[in-house]
Amino acid sequence: MNFLMSLSGGLLAGYLISGKDPFWTYSSGLAGIICASAGNDLYHPIQSMIIAMIGVVVAYKMHYWVERKFKIDDAVGAVAVHGYAGVAGLIICGFVLNGYPSSGYSVGAMWVGTDYAPINPLGMFIGAVIMFGVLGLIPGWIIAKVLHGMGKLRIPREVEIAGLDYNMLETSKQSEKAVSSATR
């Protein structure tokens, strides 16, 4: 139930905030699911829907802010859908589920005097930094630097100007000419 409510909340928010843009509407459904997934097993269905809507608004606004401010193009919106909505979902989960046990079983004596680790905003923020920064951004940046050093990160400038499919189109035109001249 929560999965479908977060999907519908994401679709609804994406449709409204993007001005009926189909790309953002469909992407926002996934962003809503990702945003609400941090606490979907503990949320009420209406909470899942509202949290998904908030996450979609954050992802949409952050996408265009980063694009304008830093001139970074996220052509398919993958960073917005997975990254911004995911971080927003983790932080929202920390506030909405503050004090809930993080697991259903005892893990020993914790620093707060209980035998389980409670969910809290700071812990969720630190988890977001570890997941997205340490396990995502830093390895991605290192791989991009290695690929750039090898000359494999971007296509050549002349191909970029002509268009990536130019060579394929020219090859297919030559093949068509060869076939048509052979049949005459």
What are these regions (language model features)?
Residues 1-184:
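Glycine- and aromatic-enriched membrane alpha-helices
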